[in-house]
């Protein structure tokens, strides 16, 4: 392989790695809809299940996220962990504002994720979420 080919290949790999890294840091909102039937549930229940938000921004004041939830007309919202992030560059207040806005409209239930544990402040985060209106589940069900 020539020196020029090696350099071109190295630049190409570096560019691909950069694009991959940027894609991983870009918070994209993904909405998926599932219909699950159960004989144990007598009336339909609409759930909005949010997970791995990592305190990312979803529009001004989290408008994109809140609008995406509202369109689904949920009966309640489930927060399945990693709502905040252990990275200090991700503003925790953004996650708390999201929870507060959700709780103003729907019942909100939260379970702790690994990133909350990694902060070393699990109990504090749970209390902050409770104060914003979330029901914090710990080894129990709603």
Task: Describe every region a protein language model picked out.
Residues 1-41:
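N-terminal membrane-anchoring alpha-helices
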Residues 43-137:
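Membrane-embedded segments
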Residues 138-142:
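A substrate-binding/cap region within the structured catalytic cores of diverse enzymes
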């Amino acid at each position: 392989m020539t020196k020029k080919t090696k350099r071109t290949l190295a630049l190409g790999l570096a560019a691909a790695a950069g694009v991959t890294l940027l894609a991983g840091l870009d918070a994209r909102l993904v909405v998926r809809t599932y219909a699950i039937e159960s004989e144990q549930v007598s009336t339909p229940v609409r759930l909005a299940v949010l997970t791995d938000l990592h305190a990312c921004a979803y529009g001004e004041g989290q408008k994109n996220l809140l609008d995406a939830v509202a369109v689904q007309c949920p009966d309640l919202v489930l927060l399945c962990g990693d709502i905040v992030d252990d990275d200090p560059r991700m503003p925790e207040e953004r996650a708390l504002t999201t929870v507060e806005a959700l709780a103003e409209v729907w019942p909100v239930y939260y379970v702790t994720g690994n990133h909350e544990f990694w902060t070393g402040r699990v109990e504090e985060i749970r209390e902050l979420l409770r104060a914003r209106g979330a029901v914090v589940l710990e080894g129990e069900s709603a």
